[in-house]
Amino acid sequence: MSGHNKWASIKHKKTATDVKKGKVFTKIIREIVVATKESGAQIENNARLRKAIEDAKEANMPQDNIKKAIQRGTGEIPGAIYEEMVYEGYGPAGVALIVEVTTDNKNRTASDIRKMFSSHNGNLGEAGCVGWMFERKGYITVKKSAADEEIVMNTVLEAAVEDFKSEADSDVYEIITLSSDLETVKNVLKEKNITVESAEVTMVPQTQIALKSDNAKNMLKLMDALEDHDDVKNVYANFDISSEDMEKLNA
């Protein structure tokens, strides 16, 4: 199983706790504000806003919160001014990381990110130091229990996806598309009544670094620390941890 999918699974388990902390709401509200400011409030013409609202509903965010976030994005009501920033660096064993943030204070955020890297055997690098190791792609998952593998595979191959994976130790099918084709492939699956578990634009590493023992433990702690920060939107990394080692770490 890929490191990306393992981390996606860990994040999924954390979601319920994060909602209680309000972290998920905070991050989704910022995404709605930025998406609205960027491309307007009409969801039929704004795929990014549409995805953010879907995430908000999945997290059971009150409709009033969604409405106010959109109004902040259009400027109808006042609010913080957010900037989107990207940080790049290295984690344990030279793992490459890309950290996307949405912040109203870039100096504070940069300081926080730098401290997290250094306290987990990593270091923050210069812009572009690791970005070339990743490609922006569409990433879709479908629960194996939701549909037959052959049906899902034939459906997505007809839609000209880049890759289809069905790993033995995973409970989902993984589908990789061009980032521009994500919505199209997602809609093709829905037309075939195949339930999509998740669909997002992500950064896929061209190669991965296998981690074990302390390096694996420190890497997961760094990922956890970064994703727990209110300003952090996404974290991408090119590590892989075997299922056996992951079970030991979770024991």
From Swiss-Prot:
GO biological process, one term: regulation of DNA-templated transcription
Protein family according to the UniProt entry: Belongs to the TACO1 family.
Source organism superkingdom: Bacteria
One GO molecular-function entry: DNA binding
NCBIfam families for the chain: PRK00110.1, PRK12378.1, YebC/PmpR family DNA-binding transcriptional regulator
Subcellular location: Cytoplasm
Alphabetized UniProt keyword annotations: Cytoplasm, DNA-binding, Transcription, Transcription regulation
Full protein name: Probable transcriptional regulatory protein TGRD_462
HAMAP family in the cross-refs: Transcrip_reg_TACO1 (MF_00693)
InterPro entries: Integrase-like_N, TACO1_YebC-like_2nd/3rd_dom, TACO1_YebC_N, Transcrip_reg_TACO1-like, Transcrip_reg_TACO1-like_dom3, YebC-like
UniProt GO cellular component terms: cytosol
Source organism phylogeny: Bacteria, Pseudomonadati, Elusimicrobiota, Endomicrobiia, Endomicrobiales
